[in-house]
């Protein structure tokens, strides 16, 4: 299987500091940065339209932001819900509802106060929305804190309307419970994900991944650094379930290299690794996915393709079934279309010619506008040169 991805749009100097995370929904792409701002980028652009002309920013926190995720859903009575959750470097977990003005279509950020005073005392790190396709079941939010605890909430958009004919927007988060760190002393919980099969994966800085059951919050099994024993790896950078929830992809370090290991989720068995040949004197041939850390992972909508974002300035695409590399996209600062927005060196004078990739997300077919948008997969990434870039598959089916 061969795929070719082509650049469709980009924005250099998209933020005034490093862009650590990106998320997407049908309407928007959302980025967050160390400059403390959330930015919402309209997915529906006209040909040759500058993404910055349809972007909207909101200052959130002076310490900067490092994780973001967006939940978009159509609730009862066609009520449209678009919620953004983000975490700051001071440990705050913050929420915004995104709406548009009826006439101007300008984006409005409505801050939501969803945590009680005791919960606000915790220092949060990674987060993930879990959308429910069943209106009888609540959407979920999972987040980790720096002590290794995973928190799970149920999200309720409306007040109790059992005796009312109209919906009353009154968003609340109901704490379902917590999953404690499986280790003593506790380790830093670096990443988290939630699957459609009702599983939670929490990754830790010592190379351990814990799998828990969403309905009961019961820990099912740990990957006790199995990959650490094999590849001398440590910190977990990303955990990502496949769309069907049958696979879990884990990005982890091995010294200065980046590794990807696949597990099936029913029994937690390791089914293989994704790798490219390397002739480094530090490594055996064919053990690593990237020549530097793998910062992020994203499955396409079918779960057949996995994209990995590397600190080596590469996006790699993998056939999940064969575990073979399909293609590689190389980032370069000169890819940015507007010359004055090119950031070739950082504030320390170090080169950004091949900027590392902080985060990557596949976008579903039809989310972006343009030629072939309904037929082709697309994706977005954010890079160390403070750029945000969109690509789409050439061809499609």
Swiss-Prot record:
It comes from the Eukaryota. WD repeats lie at residues 21-42, 67-101, 126-157, 191-213, 238-264, 296-319, 359-392. One of its GO terms (cellular component) is nuclear chromosome. InterPro entries: SKI8, WD40/YVTN_repeat-like_dom_sf, WD40_repeat_CS, WD40_repeat_dom_sf, WD40_rpt. One of its GO terms (biological process) is protein-containing complex assembly. Involved in double-strand break (DSB) formation during meiotic recombination through stabilization of SPO11 association with meiotic chromosome and helping SPO11 to recruit other DSB proteins like REC102 and REC104 to meiotic chromosomes. Also a component of the SKI complex involved in 3'-mRNA degradation pathway. Represses dsRNA virus propagation by specifically blocking translation of viral mRNAs, perhaps recognizing the absence of CAP or poly(A). Essential for controlling the propagation of M double-stranded RNA (dsRNA) and thus for preventing virus-induced cytopathology. Belongs to the SKI8 family. Component of the SKI complex composed of at least SKI2, SKI3 and SKI8. The SKI complex interacts with SKI7, which makes the link between the SKI complex and the exosome in order to perform mRNA degradation. This is Antiviral protein SKI8.
